[in-house]
A protein has these predicted regions:
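Acidic (Asp/Glu)-rich catalytic clusters
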Residues: 41-47, 62-76, 93-106, 140-141, ...
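Active-site beta-loop-alpha junctions enriched in small/polar residues
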Residues: 29-31, 56-58, 80-86, 154, ...
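Active-site gating loops and adjacent loop-to-helix segments of metal-dependent hydrolytic enzymes
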Residues: 90-119, 230-240
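C-terminal domain-boundary segment and adjacent tail
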Residues: 177-180, 234-307
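Histidine/acidic-residue-rich catalytic or RNA/ligand-binding cores of hydrolases
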Residues: 36-38, 88-91, 189-196, 224-235, ...
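Catalytic domains of cell-wall/extracellular-matrix polysaccharide-remodeling enzymes
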Residues: 122-202, 206
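Conserved, mostly hydrophobic/aromatic
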Residues: 30, 77, 149, 215, ...
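Active-site beta->alpha N-cap acidic-glycine motif
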Residues: 19-88
Length: 312
């Protein structure tokens, strides 16, 4: 069942009333960062189920995903605001000239691999704003009709001052912010073993209560390109490409679509929410002040170095 059909169908006899309605945004994160991710997205758009796509624009494969999405106006497109580059073998940097945002990049002009590394540098608020604005502008220039924005690895909202920048930009560009429309995250299938992801995804849908929900997935194909990448973060998954292929397969599984139909789950996207509820957006959390986040990041790095020294 496609999003367009779900949005246009009127409630029929036997279907859930509005108070019992289950609304679901299926958001696909990270397209644009590599060809394998884009091809996972392509498969889902053609064979599977999704409603929103969050594109990283500061990455090498932006043009491919921009062209792909032009053929799929039924999904909403978001700016996946990024301040990290987490892959050991595949680094990217800012859209802005790196010399103009030096507090958010490493010695080679690339983003840091983790939030902690970034925050330990005491990034300048004005440079964060400059870069996030540049990312939105580049996406628009490439023809991406942004309906919303969100944040890769949480870095762009990791401090209160950053969160306020994201909210300011959303207001200026008249776009939504994912999770600000009351959508609650479903149980994640991210770390579920690949051979169990489809069953788990179906189980998640079967157990959704009435209300508005957000399912975040990470498309990809198990190509050599993606298989060669290693996450620099300790929580990163081994065989990441196998996991992302499994998420793609789950969203293309007939059983996944069937439970949406059977339960009368209404697929919604941020085009709809932006049009109808932009004025109703509410902050779902409040980040800690930048000074506190920087202090904590530096303390954690110090403890990590001490631990490493103790092991030698």
């Amino acid at each position: 069942m496609g999003l367009e059909q779900s949005l246009s169908e009127e409630t029929k006899e036997g279907e859930p009333s509005q108070k019992d309605q289950i609304e679901l945004v299926i958001r696909l994160d990270d397209p644009g960062f590599c060809h394998s991710a884009n091809m996972g997205l392509k498969k889902i758009l053609e064979q599977g189920t999704c409603s929103s796509v969050s594109v990283i624009v500061a990455t090498p494969w932006l043009d491919e995903v921009a062209e792909l999405l032009r053929s799929h106006p039924e999904v909403s497109v978001g700016a996946h605001l990024v301040l990290n580059s987490e892959w050991k073998e595949f680094k990217w940097g800012p859209v802005s000239p790196y010399t103009e945002v030096s507090s958010i990049v490493d010695a080679f002009g690339k983003f840091f691999g983790s939030r902690r590394e970034l925050m330990a540098q005491a990034p300048k608020v004005e440079e964060v704003e400059k870069e996030l604005r540049a990312q939105i502008d580049l996406g628009l220039k490439k023809g991406l009709n942004f309906a919303y924005c969100d944040y890769h690895m949480g870095a762009a909202v990791n401090a209160l001052e950053f969160q306020e920048i994201v909210e300011k930009l959303a207001g200026e560009y008249r776009i939504g912010i994912s999770r600000y429309f009351g959508e609650k995250d479903t149980e994640s299938i991210y770390s579920v073993p690949p051979d169990k992801k489809t069953d788990k995804a179906i189980e998640v849908l079967e157990n959704l209560p009435p209300g508005r929900h957000l399912m975040v997935c990470h498309p990809g194909m198990n190509y050599p390109e993606m298989a060669a990448m290693t996450d620099l973060n300790s929580f990163g998954l081994k065989e990441m490409s196998v996991h992302r292929q499994a998420e793609t397969d789950a969203l293309c599984d007939p059983g996944f679509r069937e439970v949406i139909r059977k339960r009368g789950i209404k697929l919604i996207n941020y085009n709809h929410l932006r049009k109808e509820e932009l004025h109703l957006m509410t902050r779902p959390f409040t980040a800690k002040p930048l000074e506190e986040v920087v202090r904590q990041a530096r303390m954690e790095k110090k403890l990590e170095r001490a631990d490493e020294a103790g092991k030698k």
